[in-house]
Curated annotation (Swiss-Prot):
Binding sites annotated in the UniProt record for Zn(2+): H270, H272, H282
Cofactor(s) for this UniProt protein: Zn(2+)
Keyword tRNA-binding: no
Main localization (coarse): nucleus
Descriptive protein name: Ester hydrolase C11orf54 homolog
Pfam families linked to this entry: DUF1907
Origin organism lineage: Eukaryota, Metazoa, Chordata, Craniata, Vertebrata
Length: 319
């Protein structure tokens, strides 16, 4: 795994779950007409519609930001290849369950695309279980092509960048978010992140987890199969390069968000999702505010690990 830079570690503020529920509910009420946030037992995530390789989101929760957008933009750095099993060791949780948002490895796939990681990493006496999905542009019709990673590849590699939530995959108490009918401009994730930023100020609070769009549609993007040969120097350049789609519920998203970057050049939110009808990619927001219904499960992380932080950075292409 390319980890030429050292891994940096930062202890996060971990609010009481009941308190965090109140904070999130208050903020979400400004952006959705019908909101309920509560502490509940994590549902069995091995069941549908999730189909994860573990039952829960609990047990030593932590997040990591691996590589970064500067490995993709303005021009790609193809040598930046990482591995989920190695990441689990870097975040001091060998055998962790990892979910989040990243990019597939060009070295493995021979193309570029969006990765929806769902990996139970290897442990002593146990091989890794890779339940990830990936999306690319179908060369035949230019539409979204979503595939199960293990149907095509047998590794746990990824490329360029990822924002990941790692835990022991155990059942336990989590925060359940129900939000319907969006009245504000922010996406569910942006609203939650901004709400925490406003309430916790200088403290950094991070959440990881999964949410379903049960009704409605969402705007996503998928990166082209080929990397840009011309430098992508502005957000407009990036936007014109990406392929945008409207996709339909039910959609299962994995997200990592942090209220405040503690000086580690973090991507403050990143969300990818899949479906069981062949649509998936990088989430922006819903496109059906009057009918959208969200159901999500989240947990605050205790620590953030910054793996292979780019030496030269910028803020282009982080939406």
């Amino acid at each position: 795994m390319d980890n030429s830079g050292k891994t940096e570690k930062f202890q996060l503020h971990v609010p009481n779950l009941e308190e965090l529920c109140q904070v999130l509910e208050s903020g979400l009420n400004k952006n959705f007409s019908d909101v309920k946030v509560s502490v509940t037992d994590c549902p069995d995530l091995t069941q549908q519609p999730f189909g994860f390789p573990v039952k829960g989101l609990c047990g030593k929760p932590r997040i990591t930001d691996v590589g970064g957008v500067p490995n993709l933009i303005p021009l790609v750095k193809l040598d930046k290849v990482y591995n989920m099993n190695s990441v689990s060791k870097e975040v001091e949780l060998p055998g962790a369950f990892i979910l989040g948002a990243g990019a597939i490895s060009f070295k493995t796939a021979g193309i570029n695309g969006e990765l929806m990681p769902l990996v139970l990493t290897e442990a002593e006496g146990r091989s890794a279980v890779n339940a990830s999905y990936f999306s690319s542009i179908n060369p035949e019709d230019g539409k979204c092509l979503q595939e199960k990673y293990s149907d095509r590849f047998d590794d746990c590699d990824f490329g360029l960048l990822a924002n990941l939530y790692a835990c022991e995959g155990k059942p336990g108490k989590v925060i359940e978010v129900k939000a319907c009918r969006r009245t504000g401009e922010d996406s569910l994730v942006s609203c939650m992140r901004k709400t925490m930023a406003e309430h916790y100020g200088e403290k950094s609070v991070a959440l990881g987890g999964t949410f379903i769009i049960q009704k409605g549609k969402a705007k996503i993007h998928i990166m082209p199969r080929e990397f840009s040969v011309c430098p992508l120097n502005t957000d407009e350049d990036v936007n014109n390069w990406l392929r945008h789609f409207e996709v339909s519920a039910p959609l299962i998203f994995q997200t990592v968000m942090i209220s405040r970057d503690p000086g580690l050049d973090l991507r403050v939110e990143h969300t990818h999702g899949f479906s069981h009808h062949g649509e998936g990619g990088h989430y922006y927001t819903d496109t059906t505010p009057n009918t959208v219904e969200y159901l999500g499960y989240f947990l605050p992380a205790e620590t953030v690990y910054r793996i292979d932080r780019p030496t030269e950075t910028h803020n282009v292409g982080r939406d």
